[in-house]
Amino acid sequence: MVKLRLKRCGKKQRAVYRIVAIDVRSRREGRDLRKVGFYDPIKNQTYLNIPVILNFLEQGAQPTGTVQDISKKAGFFMDL
């Protein structure tokens, strides 16, 4: 099963996150299938590759709660 979840990047005390499609059995920093977005909580910036995310959702991927909240703030999950 594939999930859309956050992968931590950046420095200590300066975390940024990539939104990735990853196998459920992989750890947080494990090998991802594809990078589908970016989230910076300090600068409050979000980038979502919407066509790729829709493709993974159609194939049965499940977003985690945090990724779903970030997507709602960006206005993406309003229609779904």
Curated annotation (Swiss-Prot):
This is Small ribosomal subunit protein bS16c. Keywords: Chloroplast, Plastid, Ribonucleoprotein, Ribosomal protein. Its main location: plastid. The keyword Ribosomal protein applies. It is found in: Plastid, Chloroplast. It comes from Lotus japonicus. InterPro entries: Ribosomal_bS16, Ribosomal_bS16_CS, Ribosomal_bS16_dom_sf. Induction: Transcribed and spliced in green leaves. One of its GO terms (cellular component) is mitochondrion. Belongs to the bacterial ribosomal protein bS16 family. The keyword Ribosomal protein applies. GO terms for molecular function: structural constituent of ribosome. It comes from the Eukaryota. One of its GO terms (biological process) is mitochondrial translation.
